[in-house]
Design a protein with these regions (language model features):
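Surface-exposed polar/charged interaction patches
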Residues: 12-19, 75-78, 116, 128, ...
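Generic recognition of long tandem-repeat/solenoid scaffolds
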Residues: 25-32, 50-53, 93-95
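Amphipathic protein-protein interaction modules
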Residues: 66-121
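N-terminal "first-domain core" detector
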Residues: 1-35
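Hydrophobic beta-strand residues in large extracellular and virion-surface proteins
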Residues: 9, 27-29, 38-40, 50, ...
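Intrinsically disordered, low-complexity regulatory segments enriched in Ser/Thr/Pro
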Residues: 34-67, 111-160
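Histidine (H) residue identity feature
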Residues: 12, 59-61, 100
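Short linear motifs in intrinsically disordered
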Residues: 17-20, 36-45, 83-89
């Protein structure tokens, strides 16, 4: 295993500093804006999805270099962000959210997207969430606030 397994990243992201770690056998694409770097691992023993891409709270498994490049490009171009949900400060689950979805963000949207809209509601399993992007100017933390009618609104905190 070695650095040669990550050459394809240099071809696409040469304007970013990349650090290869022999001890961890991974490449880290350095984020010039924050500490949320992109880490790519290659695990050849996994014949189906040998690449793991990590950004912020999230990770994804990929089977080929092209999909890895596409995912990283989406992050760097700020088309997708990492979103993580919490309950009492503990991670519950997460995923990605697009720029368009962020522009129309509502509790109802998050509930539908998460799948917690049946007998178990999103509000029953989480109480806050965080959004992180390549450029932290769009990062924020948020909580759910309930009004007297039972309606839920999102209140952003730690907005950059």
């Amino acid at each position: 295993m070695g650095k040669e397994n990550y050459c394809f990243l240099s071809n696409h992201f040469s304007s970013y500093e990349m650090i290869y770690s022999e001890s961890k056998d991974c490449v880290e694409i350095i984020n010039p804006f924050s500490n949320d770097n992109i880490i790519v691992d290659y695990i050849p023993e996994d014949e189906f999805t040998p690449y793991i891409c990590q950004f912020s709270f999230q990770h994804r498994h990929y089977e080929n270099e092209e999909d890895v490049v596409e995912y990283i490009s989406e992050i760097i171009n700020q088309n997708i962000y990492a979103i993580e949900f919490f309950k009492d400060g503990k991670n519950r689950f997460g995923g990605d959210i697009t720029t368009h979805e962020l522009s129309e963000l509502s509790y109802e949207f998050l509930e539908q997207r998460s799948g917690y809209y049946g007998s178990t509601k999103l509000k029953d399993v989480v109480d806050s969430f965080k959004v992180r992007g390549w450029n932290p100017c769009n990062d924020f933390d948020a909580t759910f606030v309930y009004d007297d009618n039972g309606d839920i609104t999102i209140v952003k905190t730690n907005y950059k």
